[in-house]
Regions:
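Core alpha/beta catalytic barrel or barrel-like domain that forms the active/cofactor pocket
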Residues: 36-37, 210-226
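Anionic group-transfer/hydrolysis microenvironments
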Residues: 20, 27, 103, 222, ...
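Generic structural signal for well-ordered secondary structure
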Residues: 52, 56, 60-63, 90, ...
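N-terminal glycine/serine-rich phosphate-binding loop of ATP-dependent small-molecule kinases
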Residues: 1-108, 123-124, 155, 216, ...
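Active-site core segments that coordinate phosphate-bearing ligands/cofactors
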Residues: 2-11, 15-16, 120-176, 185-202, ...
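Carbohydrate-associated surface elements
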Residues: 115
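Short beta-strand-loop/turn "lid" adjacent to the catalytic site in phosphate-handling enzymes
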Residues: 75-112, 132-134, 167-188, 219-232
Length: 452
C-alpha cells in the first residue's frame, strides 16, 4: 500500500474544496478517501445595498489562501510540493444568483442563498409550476430581477451558483452536478434534466416580458455524479495556484452543493435515508420517492445521482449562538483570561446540558436574517425573559440551542405528520454537532428520532 507521501508524489491524491458560509475548506484524500492534508480560509458575508454578498475578490482570495494553506500542510507533513492531482472537485453554498454577460463579466454583485428579497417571484413561480420554489433558489432570484425591471437581465448569457462559477472558471465548462442544479431550477422526476414543462412555462413568461434568451441557453447543464465534467485548464490552474506549481489537465467531478456533500458524507443517498446539516443554516434531507403536496416549508431537490429528496431548509441556525460566544470571548479577554474559541464553544455547549428542559422560561428568537419557513423577510435576533425566569448559563445556552432548531422542527413535523414520510434515524454533521453528544441530543429531541 502506498504511503500518503507516495500518493502525493505520484499525483494520485484527490482534492475537494468546499465554500461554506464562514469557511473555505480544502481537503486532500488518498485512494481510500482518508484525509491526508488540509487547508482553510475564514470568510464572512456582508450586507451591501440590501443584499447578502461576497465579492469576487473575496472568492478568489479565499480560494487561493485555502489552497496555499493546504500546500503548506503538505510540505510540512511530507516534505514535498503539490504539483499533480488525481482529481479535483468543488462544492459550495447552493442557490443564489451569479449572472454574467457574453464577455464573462459579473452583471450584479453575487446574491447569496441568504437573501429574502424574492418573495413575490417565489410565490408566483410556485403557483405557476404547482411546485414549491423557495426564495433562495436561483430561478426565484432571476424572476424577481425580471419583475423589478432590472436592466442587467436582458444582458444575461450565463446564470450559475458559486460552485458552478468556480467550476466554469477552472475548466471552461458550464456543467454542474444534478443535485446542485436542483437548487437552481426544478429537476424532472426520473431524469437528470430540468423539468421540461416548467422550463417551457418560464420561457413563455420571459418571452412575454421581452427577453430573448431561454433557460436552456443560460443555465448550466445538469449531470449525475460520475459524469466527466471537464479538466483543469492552464488558466484555471493559475487561478487556483498562482505560484505555478499545480499542473493543468486534472479531471474535475461535476460540482455539487452543500446538500449533496452532506448526503454523501453521511452515506444518506439511498431511498429511506436521511441526514441533517447544522451550521450557519440548517437543513434536513430525506431521500424519498413519495409524491407530496406543495408545502412552502418543503423543498424538493435531488441526490447527486438524481433521486428525489425532500428538504427542510432554514436560513438561521448558529449565527446568533456565534454572536453570543464572541461576546463571552471578549469578556474573557477583558478579565485577563482569554479562551480559545474552540474550547469556549465546548464549555458553553456542555453547560446547555445542565439547563432545565424548558430553558428556565427563557425565549430566544435566533433570526439573524430572514426566515422563509416562518414568513420572515428580515432578521431581528431576540433574547426574551420574564421577571421570574431562571437566568443562568445552562438555561441560557440550552435555550439558544433549542431555538437554533425550532424552525427546522416545523418543517420536519410537516413531513412526518402530514405527509407521513417515515423517519427512523438521522445522520448529522456540521458545526452544531462538534461538541460530542450535545447538539446530537438537542437534535434528537427536535426530530423525535435517534441521531448519530
Amino acid at each position: 500500500m502506498e504511503s500518503a507521501a507516495e500518493v502525493i508524489r505520484d499525483g494520485k491524491a484527490v482534492l475537494g474544496i468546499e465554500f461554506g458560509s464562514t469557511r473555505i475548506k480544502a481537503v486532500l484524500v488518498d485512494g481510500k478517501c482518508k484525509p491526508i492534508a488540509s487547508g482553510s480560509h475564514e470568510w464572512e458575508n456582508r450586507l451591501e445595498h440590501g443584499y447578502w454578498t461576497y465579492s469576487l475578490e473575496d472568492i478568489w482570495a479565499g480560494l487561493q489562501d485555502a489552497y496555499k494553506n493546504l500546500k503548506e500542510d503538505v510540505r510540512e507533513k511530507y516534505q514535498q510540493p503539490l504539483k499533480r492531482l488525481g482529481a479535483l472537485g468543488f462544492s459550495g453554498m447552493m442557490h443564489g444568483y451569479m449572472a454574467f454577460d457574453a464577455e464573462g463579466k459579473l452583471l450584479v454583485p453575487f446574491r447569496t442563498w441568504r437573501n429574502t428579497t424574492t418573495g413575490e417571484a417565489a410565490a408566483a413561480l410556485t403557483k405557476a409550476f404547482d411546485f414549491n420554489i423557495p426564495q433562495r433558489w436561483s430561478i426565484a432570484h432571476l424572476y424577481q430581477a425580471m419583475l423589478n425591471g432590472e436592466p442587467h437581465v436582458k444582458e444575461i448569457s450565463f446564470l450559475t451558483t458559486l460552485a458552478g462559477f468556480l467550476h466554469w472558471k477552472l475548466t471552461g465548462e458550464k456543467r454542474m452536478g444534478v443535485g446542485e442544479a436542483s437548487g437552481m431550477f426544478p429537476i424532472g422526476r426520473g431524469s437528470c434534466a430540468y423539468d421540461k414543462e416548467m422550463v417551457h412555462k418560464f420561457d413563455s413568461l420571459a418571452a412575454e416580458m421581452g427577453y430573448s434568451w431561454t433557460l436552456e441557453q443560460i443555465l448550466p447543464q445538469p449531470v449525475p455524479a460520475g459524469t466527466p465534467a471537464g479538466v483543469l485548464t492552464p488558466e484555471g490552474a493559475a487561478l487556483l495556484d498562482p505560484s505555478g506549481d499545480l499542473q493543468p489537465g486534472i479531471p474535475l467531478a461535476p460540482c455539487e452543493g452543500d446538500a449533496g456533500t452532506g448526503m454523501t458524507a453521511t452515506n444518506a443517498v439511498r431511498l429511506g435515508t436521511g441526514n441533517v446539516s447544522a451550521g450557519t443554516s440548517d437543513f434536513a434531507m430525506l431521500v424519498t420517492d413519495r409524491e407530496m403536496a406543495v408545502h412552502r416549508e418543503i423543498d424538493m431537490v435531488t441526490t447527486p445521482s438524481g433521486i428525489p429528496v425532500a428538504m427542510v431548509h432554514c436560513n438561521n441556525c448558529t449565527s446568533d449562538i456565534n454572536a453570543w460566544v464572541s461576546l463571552f470571548e471578549e469578556f474573557a479577554e477583558a478579565i485577563g483570561a482569554p479562551q480559545e474559541p474552540g474550547k469556549l464553544y465546548t464549555l458553553l455547549f456542555r453547560k446547555a446540558l445542565e439547563g432545565s428542559p424548558d430553558g428556565g422560561g427563557l425565549v430566544s428568537c435566533n433570526f439573524y436574517s430572514g426566515e422563509p419557513v416562518l414568513g420572515l423577510n428580515q432578521g431581528r435576533p431576540l433574547m426574551v425573559r420574564s421577571p421570574d425566569s431562571q437566568l443562568n448559563l445552562g438555561n441560557f445556552m440550552r435555550t439558544h440551542l433549542l431555538s437554533a432548531l425550532a424552525a427546522l422542527k416545523i418543517g420536519l413535523d410537516i413531513l412526518t405528520r402530514q405527509e407521513k414520510v417515515e423517519l427512523t434515524k438521522l445522520y448529522a454533521h456540521g458545526g452544531f454537532f462538534k461538541t460530542k453528544g450535545v447538539g446530537q441530543r438537542i437534535m434528537a429531541a427536535a426530530a423525535d428520532v435517534p441521531v448519530s
